[in-house]
């Protein structure tokens, strides 16, 4: 089996998926190889955007799975006509215009949508086989997370294909669609929240006299090592947090100040607000 994948809107997230799929390790056997497209057509709205994709692909080595890439602009209809699988990578406010432009040719195609807030019901107006995906920018480096929901019409043969493609970004998690707005906040916006924590740790070191580069390196390693500790130990973060604290010590003193400043509630409320906004993104599209 060979097929073409069309990416409608190959910006930050589209390029992250393109990079992950194109550079995926060579498939172990013919069954796995069939999940990868022989060709990817990227579709953008203007020549500079298309050239950006071309420049990106030129930095890659040859695809381990023999995937070829064609970067285009203004040719959405012909790209979708050729494709069996369509990945919608446009910003949510552009999705309606883009989908209406290919409405006559997208029926019967498998649609993988990255458009936050667009529900399966809304997307099913264009094709019945729909997969909603929320991933994040670390996907570009293979360290992302992707939450996936399927329409009822997606077949048992199509799900493994989506699983294989999306797993290249990092962690693949299948959840009911009712969780997608929360996933948009936690997974999609999550890197920005973590980067705020990283920035805060860096700047605290700088304020206390540690040079910026060394402060950055230490803060990055603290985050990386802590995540690994949670992963390897299997313990709840609160248990590990209290293991660091000693009576009258530095850690509990710092934690008490952070609690007074509302750090934990601020993070929780921030994620909740991001989820609320995500729930509104598709409300105007009936």
From Swiss-Prot:
It comes from the Eukaryota. There is a cross-link at residue 171 (Glycyl lysine isopeptide (Lys-Gly) (interchain with G-Cter in ubiquitin)). Pathway: Amino-acid biosynthesis; L-proline biosynthesis; L-proline from L-glutamate 5-semialdehyde: step 1/1. Its EC number is 1.5.1.2. It catalyses: L-proline + NADP(+) = (S)-1-pyrroline-5-carboxylate + NADPH + 2 H(+); L-proline + NAD(+) = (S)-1-pyrroline-5-carboxylate + NADH + 2 H(+). The keyword Flavoprotein does not apply. InterPro entries: 6-PGluconate_DH-like_C_sf, NAD(P)-bd_dom_sf, P5C_Rdtase_cat_N, P5CR-like_CS, P5CR_dimer, Pyrroline-COOH_reductase. SUPFAM superfamilies: 6-phosphogluconate dehydrogenase C-terminal domain-like (SSF48179), NAD(P)-binding Rossmann-fold domains (SSF51735). GO terms for cellular component: cytoplasm; cytosol. It is an enzyme of class 1 (oxidoreductase). Keywords: Amino-acid biosynthesis, Isopeptide bond, NADP, Oxidoreductase, Phosphoprotein, Proline biosynthesis, Ubl conjugation. One of its GO terms (molecular function) is pyrroline-5-carboxylate reductase activity. The modification Phosphoserine is found at residue 279. GO terms for biological process: L-proline biosynthetic process; proline biosynthetic process. Belongs to the pyrroline-5-carboxylate reductase family. Present with 43500 molecules/cell in log phase SD medium. This is Pyrroline-5-carboxylate reductase. It comes from Saccharomyces cerevisiae (strain ATCC 204508 / S288c) (Baker's yeast).
């Amino acid at each position: 089996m060979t097929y073409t994948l069309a990416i409608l809107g190959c910006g930050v997230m589209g390029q992250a998926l393109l990079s992950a799929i194109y550079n995926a390790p060579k498939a172990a056997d013919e069954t796995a190889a069939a999940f990868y497209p022989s060709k990817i057509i990227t579709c953008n709205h203007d020549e500079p955007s298309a050239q950006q994709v071309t420049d990106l692909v030129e930095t890659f080595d040859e695809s381990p799975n023999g995937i070829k890439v064609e970067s285009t602009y203004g040719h959405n209809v012909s790209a979708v006509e050729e494709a069996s699988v369509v990945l919608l990578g446009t910003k949510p406010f552009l999705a309606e215009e883009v989908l209406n432009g290919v409405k006559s040719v997208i029926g019967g195609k498998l649609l993988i949508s990255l458009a936050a807030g667009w529900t399966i019901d809304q997307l099913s107006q264009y094709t019945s086989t729909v997969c909603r995906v929320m991933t994040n920018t670390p996907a570009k480096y293979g360290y992302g997370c992707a939450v996936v929901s399927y329409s009822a019409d997606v077949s048992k043969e199509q799900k493994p294909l989506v699983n294989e493609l999306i797993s290249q970004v990092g962690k693949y998690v299948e959840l009911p669609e009712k969780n997608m707005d929360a996933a948009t906040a936690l997974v999609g916006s999550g890197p920005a929240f973590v980067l705020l924590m990283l920035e805060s740790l860096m700047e605290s070191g700088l304020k206390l006299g540690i040079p910026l580069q060394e402060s950055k390196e230490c803060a990055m390693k603290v985050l990386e090592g802590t995540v690994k500790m949670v992963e390897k130990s299997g313990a709840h973060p609160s248990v590990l947090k209290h293991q660091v604290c000693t009576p009258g010590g530095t850690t509990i003193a710092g934690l008490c100040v952070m609690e007074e400043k509302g750090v934990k509630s601020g993070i929780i409320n921030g994620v909740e607000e991001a989820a609320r906004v995500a729930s509104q993104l598709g409300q105007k599209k009936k």
